[in-house]
Amino acid sequence: MVQVAVLVDFPAVAADSEAAVRREVGNMTLINEQQQIKVQKAIEQAESNTDAELVTVLAGQSDDYYFIPTMWAALIALVTPALLLQTNLWLSQTDLLWIQLIEFVVLTVVFRWQPLKLALVPKQVKFARASLVAKQQFLAQGLHHTQAETGMLIFVSEAEHYVEILADRGINKLVADDAWSNIVNHLLGQIKAGNTEAGLTGAINACGELLADKVPATHNKDELPNHLVII
């Protein structure tokens, strides 16, 4: 399933940042060093024709979700006595308490296995955490401090299968949301096919063409680093 959301205003912490398009991503593998260089060159090429500043961030995971194993283990341990009482087993209250305790400890450990833990996290929670990290990265990379408010972020979070594009108000007032949606859809298709580097460079090139038309270069500038950021 692909989830879509468009934000016209961020919370106060990111009040200078506007316009977000996000999607769920299928299976993905982070890119290697040579591919990172290709992405960097794509960013440099895109920025050569626009006053916009483009940053691309890849996150392995947006949250540790430490509470998830404990929450599920506690929930299952809580309902276990009620289920056991429906059987013909002769169990004392002490027996039930020991079963609950052992079950809670074992399940807490088992549920910390990364693939299982991520499967237990509700999709809405994963998307919310990834979206929060995207906004934090927008601020952390200084995209809200560009001279003409023309910062833009392409954010990908691998574990959450999540992609989001954020653009500052200087870009947002000139570019329709549908334009970002088309770019993200193409990026999603490439990543789901296992072509992460091709997807990123394609998205960067498409953003570069769009920004060159809407926010053309008027002076030599390079306010922010062009390398791919991996967190």
Residue ranges and their predicted role:
Residues M1-N27:
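Periodic low-complexity repeat segments enriched in small/acidic residues
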Residues K123-Q141:
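Membrane-cytosol interface motif
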Residues K135-A167:
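Acidic, Ser/Thr-rich low-complexity segments on the non-lumenal side of membrane proteins
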Residues T29-L54:
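Short, charged cytosolic
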Residues Y65-I76:
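Select subsegments of transmembrane alpha-helices in polytopic membrane proteins
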Residues I31, R169-L228:
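A membrane-cytosol interface segment of integral membrane proteins
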Residues L85-L120:
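Transmembrane alpha-helices and immediately adjacent membrane-cytoplasm interface residues
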Residues S17, D51, I154, A203:
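Residue-level signature of catalytic and energy-coupling elements of molecular machines
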